[in-house]
Design a protein with these regions (language model features):
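Extended oligomerization regions of viral-like shell subunits
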Residues: 16-101, 107-132
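Residue-level detector of functional hotspots within protein domains
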Residues: 10-11, 43
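Exposed extracellular interaction/assembly regions and N-terminal maturation sites
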Residues: 1-5, 11
Length: 132
């Protein structure tokens, strides 16, 4: 599977799981050259942030790695990291709020749905904090 297929599959999996479009892509340094050629010379060392599918691209050192996430979740993980930086990973609970409605005379109340938690490694948190 090439980088484009892997990116599409990972993005699709994230959207199916969390029902929102991600706005961060963590990608490994080892996949940098493939990603660079795909988008026409992406340079991670320039001062300006880089985007793909309206998501901020952040390079990590973990080899062969692609992960989609949301800024708000990483920021929650950073708060946990600042409280206790001894752990290797930080799990963030995710929820989705629904909007209530009235349909055919039936009232459907709004609710909060618990989604699968997302976990961030110490490396992801530290590099995110440096690059944003």
């Amino acid at each position: 599977m090439n980088i484009k297929e892997r990116l599409h599959a990972a993005r699709k999996e994230y959207i199916e799981k969390y029902k929102v479009s991600p706005n961060i892509i963590f990608v490994s340094q080892s996949l940098y050259s493939e990603l660079s050629s795909m988008v026409g010379g992406l340079n991670f060392y320039e001062a300006a942030p880089k985007y793909l599918w309206n998501a901020h691209v952040i390079m990590v050192l973990t080899p062969n790695y692609i992960k989609f996430a949301e800024h708000s979740d990483v920021k929650k993980a950073i708060k946990l990291f600042n409280i206790d930086n001894s752990r290797d990973s930080y799990k963030i609970e995710k929820t989705k709020a629904t909007i209530g409605s009235v349909s055919a005379g039936k009232h459907i109340p709004s609710q909060i749905i618990n989604l699968e938690p997302i976990e961030f490694s110490r490396e992801e948190i530290e590099i995110y904090a440096m690059q944003t």
